[in-house]
Every structure is written in structure tokens, then in C-alpha cells.
């Protein structure tokens, strides 16, 4: 079984649809407009709300604050960095070893030509900085 964390959004909804041949659960602070029957409400800022059921083999971590108008800006770090730490702790508690983590091209800065993992980090906003810090946590 896979647990998609943050699967109620745009990317998560399409991912869950593609995983229709697998047993999947969704954990999100928002309800899912398409997969309400497999969605549990939870906020990764609170370790106690990260419910990983027995039989879960992999976590797909999509949850993030990403909009440009997030206020206060500390939410980027509370969700993207501390939330990642909380997910890793919940995984450790449940004995889950596999994580698929989605980062962002925003960690490489503006006007980069096809950056990959070998490019130097040069985040230009709080979202990029927080995703870079989350990568460092993992």
C-alpha cells in the first residue's frame, strides 16, 4: 500500500488516478474532490495527525506550501521543512522505509537552463529555500 500525503491537490489527484491498480490512501489537510473515500484529514505540521496504517510500504510526499501569497512566510518552513521531519518521524515509528519526495526547480533559482541535481542551489524565494531545506532533512 502507498500513502500519498498531499494528494488532494492538482498533482496528487492525477497521481492517485494513475495508481488505480494499487492500494492507495491519501492524507491531506483538505478534502479530496475526487477521492474522498480514501482520504483522511491530517496536517503534517502535527505529528499526531500523520496516520500511517499497517501494510503501508511507501510514502509519496506531495504536501507543501507553495503559493506566492502564503502568509505568514513561516508557514513555508513549518509545512515544507518541519512537516517533512514529522513525516520522516512517522515513517520511522511505523517502520516504513520508502519515500518519494517531490522537490521543486525553485531551489535552483531563476533563469537556469534545465537544472538537475548537480546544479548549485540558488533559491529565490521562501518556497525554494524551504524545499531546499526539506531536501537537506531527507
What are these regions (language model features)?
Residues 1-20:
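N-terminal Rossmann NAD(P)H-binding glycine-rich loop of SDR-like oxidoreductase domains
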Residues 33-46:
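Rossmann-fold cofactor-recognition segment
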Residues 5, 27, 59-63, 99-105:
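SDR active-site strand-loop-helix element
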Residues 22-33:
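Conserved glycine-rich Rossmann-like NAD(P)H-binding loop of the short-chain dehydrogenase/reductase
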Residues 77-84, 100, 130-131:
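Short alpha-helix in the Rossmann-fold core of NAD(P)-dependent oxidoreductases
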Residues 86-126:
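Conserved Rossmann-fold NAD(P)-dependent oxidoreductase catalytic core, especially the SDR/UDP-sugar
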Residues 44-79, 90-93, 108-112:
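NAD(P)H-binding glycine-rich loop region in Rossmannoid oxidoreductase-like domains
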Residues 124-138:
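Active-site Tyr-X1-5-Lys
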Amino acid at each position: 500500500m502507498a500513502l500519498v500525503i498531499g494528494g488532494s491537490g492538482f498533482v496528487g489527484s492525477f497521481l492517485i488516478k494513475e495508481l488505480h491498480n494499487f492500494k492507495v490512501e491519501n492524507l491531506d489537510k483538505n478534502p479530496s474532490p475526487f477521492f474522498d473515500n480514501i482520504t483522511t484529514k491530517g496536517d503534517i505540521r502535527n505529528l499526531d495527525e500523520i496516520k500511517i496504517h499497517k501494510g503501508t510500504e511507501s510514502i509519496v510526499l506531495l504536501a507543501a506550501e507553495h503559493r506566492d501569497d502564503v502568509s505568514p512566510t513561516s508557514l513555508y518552513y513549518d509545512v515544507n521543512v518541519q512537516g517533512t521531519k514529522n513525516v520522516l518521524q512517522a515513517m520511522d515509528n511505523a517502520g516504513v522505509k520508502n519515500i518519494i519526495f517531490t522537490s521543486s526547480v525553485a531551489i535552483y533559482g531563476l533563469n537556469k537552463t534545465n537544472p538537475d541535481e548537480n546544479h548549485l542551489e540558488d533559491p529565490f524565494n521562501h518556497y525554494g529555500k524551504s524545499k531546499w531545506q526539506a531536501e537537506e532533512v531527507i
